[in-house]
Amino acid sequence: MRKLINLIALLIMASSVTWAQDKKSFTLEDLMPGGNNYYNLLPQNLYGLQWWGDVCINADIEEVKTIQPANGKENVLITLQEVNELLANKELGKINHFRNASFPYAEKMMLVNTTSNKVLIDLTKKEIIWSQPLSPKAANQDWNKESRSLAYTLDNNLFVTTADGKTQQVTDEPKGIVCGQSVHRQEFGISKGTFWSPKGNLLAFYRMDESMVTDYPQVNTSTRIATLEPDKYPMAGMTSHKVSASTIRRPKKQFI
């Protein structure tokens, strides 16, 4: 009996020594950003996760995959090569990744943007079912999934392209009056300038008159030679811009 007790004690001591030998003290290389081993110790995150109805989607660089919540198992829906082949067959451009892909319709389709088109792809049939021409310079894009109409701005004016590809210029304002963009320098939680109704048949937008505001001499340093690009900026105590809101009924240019 005594020998058995001694054997158990010996095993406990041996395991304690082994555990102590396995302990590792962290160094600055492990703990500091930029350290040789820092990024190896970070938890791995998944970026680009979206919900496709009740299905979790991982849209990364090369593939669009579904993820099973119970076990994390992934299933490839479509690849970048397959999508670009579909786009090339219809001369709709190409995409370089799926980071900007969206899934507006539950468990049905994927929306991707090329430089020249918005494209809906049926992921089950792996075919293009709809496309919409897009101006390469279109900014502040706001797409409605019900009407498939796209509101966007070119310079300071607002345009709408309907689902059948017809484009309507909503405003024709001179320089100094901005339509369809965020106002009040994005203060008060304002981050956009167009707002679709749920059915996509009405579009509300901001109109900002800043023609009375003095120019602030901003310089664009990204050009080969720095260029002057004045910005309307009301200094303290000086005249500020005026903002109003309008609503247009699609598809006719009817203001309300």
Where are these regions (language model features)?
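Bacterial Sec-dependent N-terminal signal peptides
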Residues: M1-F26
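Beta-propeller folds
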Residues: A20-I256
